[in-house]
């Protein structure tokens, strides 16, 4: 709800209030002077009225030392605005207005305070005091109430107030006491915060809250020289970072003492100088000029020195504002943006033992690094091995024995314990450079009872359950004397056998054990003697793949020999324990058959893979081989098929190439067959379609049947592989002549020409058959299609057909042989229609 009262809003409120007051004052001055104070009896005349309700009107203006023209102008505007606002508000109580226009004529650092008496008698005044102000870009609302009682020549008062920093969301309550008499005013206040820490609006990584504290005000005047007076104020606040002298100068439990001189030569003008001194040599000096205009009094009295004495009396201070600090003094707290602790925080163990330690980080930002102060630790032989950004392995350093004379009598090892105790400190730093408080890790190295060394023989033996690895532990005292007949417990991990055994040292302090395993990898062997442990790692090597437990697969087993389609080889090697065999570096895939290309082998989490491509048609056998030994029982076969391709065209006993543009002539019920990969037997392995299914359909044998004219359009016949659906082959043709018999009766050349009308026949006989009887896809009817007698007799009657050798030379052609007889009287008309 307080967000409404931002700086701009407060500025607008005060500005509009000033403008409104100015208008009201100019129009209704006379009318207001005739009204009665709302909680007082009516007075007899305007002078008494103004005397009763306009006790104190003050305007304070601080003069800048530099005093340029702009400052003087703003000062004049400030003074005028203050006087007009006070003039209007003082009709309803006492106001103090501080209107500060800056260079842009905004109202930053302005304030308005209003004391409103709501019960007023000769002995008591009950009042409310309201205020609103802007300071340091914070808007503060003050709401208070109090009572003043008058006993003989003294006034005693008590007041309380609520202060609300609406901008920064800070709240406090204030309690004050007053004791005033003629020429002397004593005031004391206490301030108590109402809210706790929250994010500061002044600093990014700080919290803020009101600082609790108090102040004492003393103001006195000389009875003999009432124009001259002085003031003293002491204020102190509690807290570690308190902004008593501003947010840029934070102090711990700061205090300040303010002393000042007041000089009022005439009632209209008051001069003053204040000196404020505080902790750590803080020092401020302020010069003040105050101009007071007392309503209802004559102009002469405003400038009469004799009137000054009356203003120092208690009767004139009845409605003065409460002397207190309305601005909330803030305390700041550096946010602990990152915290560091260790778990565990204390380690205790024998030399060489390894412990895991985790850094517990609480941070608003990501961790950048942890800085260790471990020089003493490292020098002693300790190790701090990072496992991750927050996890460490701590390896304890050797124990430091001391000479017996250095030990405390009766407390063996006490001084040694101090020498063998290490404190490691660390600081965590986040990505913004914020540091945590140092965290400590205490490490206590215990005095060992034994010195245990280890020796491993035949490390790296096969994990076949038979081949052993021998581990020998030697146990001695600190002085290297062998420890005989000492019982110890040996345990192993990761499937090594025996998993646990109890044995005694021999005369040389030696305990030996032979280990076997079916599990590949590292096994930790631990010797425990009276709680003191020593460990050593042994490694069992991989067993070779067993052909019975292993598997090999190729997918797919059929591919196209285009050098692109892949078959994936997947080999899952398992040893005789049915364990997956990892780390094979000598795996190969051996091929036998048509040549193929095999990619490098890739080891995955649970298999080994490679890919196969080829360009040759046929079969190839693939066999995995490990260490030079082929696993023949796992052999798999891959068949490579030819790339789908239309290699020829069968037409009435002849086969044409696919690049000759066949057919150029077509006729009803003409037919031809496409040949896939050099053999029509392959045609059934494909699904056939035609782009002109109505006029040029194709059957499942790849036979194209001409059913109607295509009118010069390109016909596309597509063969899609049934085994490899993404692979297709196409053949396109575009006929340019549609040929037909003009009639079913024999006619003369003249009649045939008339029957076929404008058809040009010459192209139909430009065939090598006219000279040597051979066929070719040359665009001629018989050259492309051969004997017409093999086609539908209903379309082609048996006999000769008229055509033209030249534009005027008619000849006849035998429909069966393509021969051109020397002479013929009649024949069937052969017509051709362009498409």
UniProtKB/Swiss-Prot annotation:
GO (cellular component) term, any one: cell outer membrane
InterPro entries assigned: Big_1_dom, C-type_lectin-like/link_sf, CTDL_fold, IAT_beta, IAT_beta_sf, Ig-like_fold, Intimin-Invasin_domain, Intimin/invasin_bac
Primary subcellular site in the record, as a coarse category: membrane
Superkingdom of origin organism: Bacteria
Disulphide-bonded residues: none
Start and end residues of each Big-1 domain: 451-541
Pfam families found in the cross-reference section: Big_1 (PF02369), IAT_beta (PF11924), Intimin_C (PF07979), Invasin_D3 (PF09134), Invasin_D4 (PF21764)
SUPFAM superfamilies: C-type lectin-like, Invasin/intimin cell-adhesion fragments
Alphabetical GO biological process terms: cell adhesion
Keywords: Cell outer membrane, Membrane
Keyword Iron among record annotations: no
Location(s) in or outside the cell: Cell outer membrane
Record family assignment: Belongs to the intimin/invasin family.
Function: Invasin is a protein that allows enteric bacteria to penetrate cultured mammalian cells. The entry of invasin in the cell is mediated by binding several beta-1 chain integrins.
Name this protein carries in UniProt: Invasin
